[in-house]
Amino acid sequence: MFGIDEVKIAIIGLGYVGLPLAVEFGKSRQVVGFDVNKKRILELKNGVDVNLETTEEELREARYLKFTSEIEKIKECNFYIITVPTPINTYKQPDLTPLIKASETVGTVLNRGDIVVYESTVYPGCTEEECVPILARMSGMTFNQDFYVGYSPERINPGDKKHRLTNIKKITSGSTAQIAELIDEVYQQIISAGTYKAESIKVAEAAKVIENTQRDLNIALVNELAIIFNRLNIDTEAVLRAAGSKWNFLPFRPGLVGGHCIGVDPYYLTHKSQGIGYYPEIILAGRRLNDNMGNYVSEQLIKAMIKKGINVEGSSVLILGFTFKENCPDIRNTRIIDVVKELGKYSCKVDIFDPWVDAEEVRREYGIIPVSEVKSSHYDAIIVAVGHQQFKQMGSEDIRGFGKDKHVLYDLKYVLPAEQSDVRL
């Protein structure tokens, strides 16, 4: 086994997780950043991160980092970190395609003694049961004799400028005690918050998947509370504010649960659970409730429009925001699409305005073309769907200026004071 000074790192996948890793390692040691997306590589070489997770200055500081889409350029590396997405399919089952392809790619360049670390969120057992056999088959080598693996789950929070890679504690693990120690030592070089060496790869995998499952369930609880309080004509935000006066009340807010983690990861755990004969009722109940919130929001809006005497069929609706969270360009698994589709069933004409998104990416992924400018006095209903700073700065007067004389303003994200909107979650 090689020592810490002999580690030659390749980061496989340069998205929200991989790029920050590559940049931090690249500030102090030779690193190759690999991605199959040639456009992405060209942008990064020009100092541009369209995800806005890394600044041009930070890219310049990573003077030992090289970007490539050529497999040959990673052959000399011996420490591979795989950071590809792990989505779900239309049946809400794990889609391991990116992980499988990345494992096949790395397997073709593995040499004896090499280490492969996975950061992608998976179910417990996936690394050793799914990925290791691929590495062994592609390389023709024996696991834990010729090559080794580890698991260190990503904890990146897209758009968060306070909690970043280096100041979030990192869980590490390895397939042998010696390998676990080396992997931990490698990450300690860039993680100022420190590391936590888990007892096994499965423990590390399970720890990651329950982080987001716990959060998903807490949001499901407040979503259900919001539905109850709306029927009781009680303002949900006011209730949460009052309850939050106790020190141990958890400050979760209701809303649409999208993105690449919280709305996806629980399905990885439930998939594994059902595979071993246990039906996880609470986790799946929470997922069902959160998955249906788009329909609930749409129904709330329609009822408010009818109450105001607005003809729903053929009405114009403006949705402010399309990303899955505020102040971030990430549109992966955004559940605002559920609202768009549901309103379409009522023959509403929906416009999307979001200054953070790449319009072409939205068109390609969702078949929607966002508007670049918003018409004044045009809409029968307006939904503030994402709490972007730009929308907060507008205030209710400017936002209502997009509406007709008679319209409904739905503040989904508590951007405005309660009395300034017609409907709130």
Swiss-Prot record:
Keywords tagged on the record = Capsule biogenesis/degradation, NAD, Oxidoreductase
Q: Which pathway features in its UniProt record?
A: Capsule biogenesis; capsule polysaccharide biosynthesis; Glycan metabolism; Vi-antigen biosynthesis
Catalytic function, reaction form: UDP-N-acetyl-alpha-D-glucosamine + 2 NAD(+) + H2O = UDP-2-acetamido-2-deoxy-alpha-D-glucuronate + 2 NADH + 3 H(+)
SUPFAM superfamilies named among the record's database cross-references: 6-phosphogluconate dehydrogenase C-terminal domain-like (SSF48179), NAD(P)-binding Rossmann-fold domains (SSF51735), UDP-glucose/GDP-mannose dehydrogenase C-terminal domain (SSF52413)
Task: Give GO terms for biological process.
Answer: capsule polysaccharide biosynthetic process
Query: PANTHER family attached here?
Result: UDP-N-ACETYL-D-MANNOSAMINE DEHYDROGENASE (PTHR43491:SF2)
**Family as reported in the entry's similarity comment:** Belongs to the UDP-glucose/GDP-mannose dehydrogenase family.
Q: What is this protein called?
A: UDP-N-acetyl-D-glucosamine 6-dehydrogenase
Native organism is Salmonella typhi
Organism taxonomic ancestry: Bacteria, Pseudomonadati, Pseudomonadota, Gammaproteobacteria, Enterobacterales
